[in-house]
A protein has these predicted regions:
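Short, charged alpha-helical motifs in flexible N/C-terminal segments and linkers
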Residues: 1, 101-128
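Short, conserved micro-motifs composed of acidic
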Residues: 1-28
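Charged/polar positions on well-ordered alpha helices
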Residues: 6, 56, 90, 109-112
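Short intrinsically disordered coil segments
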Residues: 14-19, 47-52, 127-128
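Basic, alpha-helical interaction scaffolds
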Residues: 23-91
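Structured alpha-helical bundle/scaffold domains in large eukaryotic membrane-trafficking regulators
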Residues: 73, 93-96, 119-126
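Charged boundary/loop elements
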Residues: 86-100, 104, 111
Length: 128
């Protein structure tokens, strides 16, 4: 994978070791320290993966901790869900409205899981 103005580089990359030449395969995306970089430096696949991971953790929390108080839920949400979504966000900071809405939906669904504030509007649930 190459970064630059012209990503249509035709040269092959290789690694030489003990007089042996190993060709390196070209990739469309790479996972580095948990952040998925693609050849266009768009983080759509990374955001999709993190949002899906957050939903699966929310499902796990919902199945195992049905009648949880507000403070306990906030603690579990921040440690298990939000940490996944916000990891390295200074690198992949979402700038497209579509990506921001995907991430916001995770929090919206999480606030609906708390029985004591479930019936409030989303804005009021965030103020709690």
């Amino acid at each position: 994978m190459s970064y630059g103005r012209d990503c249509r580089i035709n040269s092959d990359y290789y690694l030489c070791c003990n007089d042996t030449r190993y060709n390196l395969e070209k990739l469309d995306s790479i996972n580095d320290l948990g952040v998925i970089f693609d050849k266009n430096l768009k983080f759509d696949s990374h955001i999709d993966k993190k949002v899906n991971k957050a939903y699966s953790i929310l499902g796990l929390i919902n199945r195992n901790f049905r009648n949880m108080n507000f403070k306990s839920f906030v603690l579990i949400y921040k440690s298990m869900v939000r940490s996944h979504v916000e990891y390295a966000n200074s690198v992949w900071s979402p700038y497209k409205i579509m990506d921001i809405e995907k991430i916001e939906k995770v929090q919206k669904r999480a606030t609906k899981m708390i029985n004591s504030i479930k019936n409030l509007t989303y804005e009021n649930r965030l103020r709690m």
